[in-house]
Amino acid sequence: MTIYNHVNFFSKIVNNKIICLDLGDKNIGVAISDQGLKFANPLKVIKRKNFKTTVEKLTSIIELENIGGIVIGWPLNIDGTQGPRCDSTRDFAHAFLRKYKIPICFHDERLSSIAADNLLKETNLKRKQKEKKLDAVAASWILQSLLDVYNNKNLEVLNG
């Protein structure tokens, strides 16, 4: 498998859900789509201990949920340039592909944590509960933004 652009990624997804990963230094937020690829929902937060454990946890989700592809948040700088976090994200994706063959694509994650934080402020959750959910909510925001573009048939704009 390889890392695909958006159009080619969606051509590989047939009757499957997709997950989105928001990679952080300590945690990975995970969101999941419905099978119709319309809606994203926060799924869980995985604590990053070591790569082997992370792969095992992600593989378990992939197999349990019938996942056909993975979207990974692409951490561009606010001005749209790639920084060192893009390098580590790319390295993670390639390392994961060596362990598990599944279509992967990147999607712009700029402002996802801010959007997730703002959304969680609207809830009645306590601060610690919000912190536990933040990364998964950010992943769902990233995934929903891609699903919205996909469902509006505007993927070519992203691959421009």
Model-predicted regions and their roles:
Residues 1-19, 26-160:
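Phosphate- and other anionic-substrate recognition elements at nucleic-acid/protein interfaces
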